[in-house]
Amino acid sequence: RQRQMCIRDRLIMAITSVALFVHIVVICAASTREVVANKEFVWYNGKRPITYSLPGSVSPVVTVALDMFKGDMQQVTGVLPQKTLFGTAVINIIQLDKNKSILRDLRKDGIPVDSIVARKDAFFIKIRENQLLVVGSDGRGTAYGILELSRLAGVSPWVWWGDVTPMRKERLTLPADYSTFQSPSVEYRGIFLNDEDWSLQPWSWKNFEPSDIKGRIGARTYKEIFKLLMRLRANAIWPGMHGITTPFYFVPGAKEAADSCGILIGTSHCEPMMRNNVGEWKVNERGDYNYITNREGVQSYWIERLKEAGPYENFYTMGMRGIHDSGMEGVKTLQEKTDALQQVIDDQRKLLSKYVDKDVEKIPQAFVPYKEVLQIMENGLQLPEDITLIWCDDNYGYMTRLSDEEQQKRSGGAGVYYHLSYWGRPHDYMWLCTTQPGLIYSEMKQAYDCNARRLWVVNVHDLKPAAYDLELFLDMAWNINSVSPSTLVEHQKSWLCREFGKEAGEKLLPAMLEFYRLCGIRKPEFMGWNQVELDKKKYTKGWSPVKNTDFSLTEFGGELDRYLESYEAIKEILSEVEPMIPQERKDAFFAQIKYPVFGAAAMSTKILEAQRARCISPGSCDTTLWTRESQLMAACAKSIKAYQEIRDLTDYYNNELADGKWKYSMCHNPRDLYVFYPPKVPVWLTDKEIEKYASLKRTKSLPLAEAVKDSCIVSNACDYTSASKGVVTIQSLGHSMNAVSVPKGKSITFEFDCLWDGEAILRTAVIPTQPNDKGDIRFSVSIDGEKPRICSIKEPFRSEGWKQNVLRGQAVRETGHQLTKGKHTLSITALDDHVLIDQWMIDFKPDRMFYVFPVQPTY
């Protein structure tokens, strides 16, 4: 009987191989007249359903991707694609690692099989004799190839999460010579669901899949997350780990859902061996989380999870810290910490070898030298070569360390943990996602160039608010050359056109560029000019109160008004574009464009109009600003109305958007921080008074050309007169939106006319990057060949200087100079790597109080 089964299996394999071979022969023999005549390949003609073939075996992730593709095509064409026989299908799909018997025949047909199979997650698509061939190196690669067809049909990756309903099409075509071969630049690419308490988590357990278990992000939710990651060509996740959230491995079906979607599970820097300590370690049951005094208990805890997780694809975090984001327990001196951590890692390797794979070097492992752990690593910790070093940013988008030349030689390579949202000092940003695209590009390209190519993970509190920034991050992880310093704007334009149509997308582009500029000047969450995690003895909760901003009502023709006017201008653009948006994309437009723009504008109005009201009210310290009562009332009314507008926008998001699909997903006041409170105005108005006064027009700011005549010369760095070879302008970065990367030893030079004599201050604004080694970030300035003045922007982590830099998005350094009327030359030279110059300003009134350099942005 066994012999009969063996013969049967061999016969099936032989038939399959022959069928595949015949299939390719049929492809080669098919008529090409239609393709040649029309110079295009028609894969849907509006009459018959799209057909596909899936010969041989495939991984579960391919089945999931195929179901997604079929659903996409049903929305695009109105007809569900049909599976058919070899040789007759429009689309033919092959997963190479499951069908090795066909490799020789594919080679004969000119398919670059060897190049495909040599790469993980790779796919190749080509039109062959009036049929479309999709070849994947493995399960994920095949799945990405299938979903690439959805992209080619105009389906957005945000079709479900962003409600970007596909547009119906009567015809789908590709160029007759179309082909693409894609493979990832970074091996593992994914997200860390963190600080999910006010968005993803309540939406999941209260709305999307209601549960009696408070805080549970269910398996259905995870499945939708994983499907989005598939569409974004990502393959890794660190699940939510807050105490209020049910641990991932406690959610029935969650790990199976990940496996079916080809998603690798990892954990953050304080969750070794796949354990969520915050939610899983119970001190009253297990004792102290202390490897010195409770080594057996800790190991038993780890072994439990290794037995459970071992059969699945994981990336194991090595080492040990405290239960949450704190140092290791039971050790005091640096040497004690080093010895203890060495023992932990040695023991963890033995456990992995015993319970996961005897060849421990084949198991993906990560070590995160974060906070105190970096000091321990540099104290002589012996870290096996195959373990991947995961470097972190400073929580605000600026990388703090990357592998040196020796570390870049490690077989385990390196990776990056990056933030698009954050809970902590100097201030949280967990409401909107406003990290400038140019900053993401600059920092991640630098990381890639330093060989951080094994794992990229980005911290997001939710998926929807981070849509564009998240996709840019993952686009770079998939193809590091998908964007460049000079194509960042084009990348965003393409994204907007894909989401909202060509005409609307092109009109939205200048508005969204301005949005990122204004948020780069100050994130909405930072508008209170206050901080968190301060001394609790001095401040209630450790939070300082909201105070007046550095925006001036009077300097440079009213920079406070100019900032508000800029927001009003982009709101007007959105109001003009909104009627152009197809009805089926209205929900997407609201969530991805209108809510963040109108919300950020309202936050600025709330804060700045309240500041105006306090300044012009009777009793103000600045009596020159006392004005008529109506102006005071108007400022109060505008501030209060803006506060209510944020609440109204959020109410619509949660209760009406997509018929309530996203209820509980948007919170306008995460952690209930002071910046989200009602405004501090001298007079709280009634609804009738608000209606009466809010419509009064504010005084307009002076045009910048007129405002800067007041004893200053100002320029964006990108407007240089000359530059050394290697100088590069990076779009969508800085207050200028075109910061300049100046390589070490290189310079940019400016010629300018001075209308005044005397002493002046040169203010040089630089992107507050961090040295990626133990070095510095220095530049020098020199006017007319004088002795260069050396400036450093290096600041200790969490120092007040560092805090102000990340809140402002610039590090400003001042130097004194003696100038005369006439022509002059300014030279700025980089003395270290990663110097990014944003703006400069020569000011003959060094004591003036202002915030923004008074110069037009350059788009």
Where are these regions (language model features)?
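Gly/Pro-rich turn-and-neighbor structural signature
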Residues: 172, 249, 257-259, 284-411, ...
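Extracytoplasmic
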Residues: 673, 680-859
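Contiguous, structured surface segment used for ligand recognition
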Residues: 29-183
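Ordered core of a single globular domain
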Residues: 567, 574-647
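Structured mid-domain segments that build the active-site/substrate or prosthetic-cofactor binding neighborhood
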Residues: 230, 235-238, 245-248, 253, ...
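Bacterial Sec-dependent N-terminal signal peptides
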Residues: 1, 8-37
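Short, small-residue-biased leader/transition segments that mark boundaries at the very start
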Residues: 1-7, 627-699
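Feature activates predominantly on carbohydrate-active enzymes
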Residues: 112-293, 310, 366-370, 378-398, ...
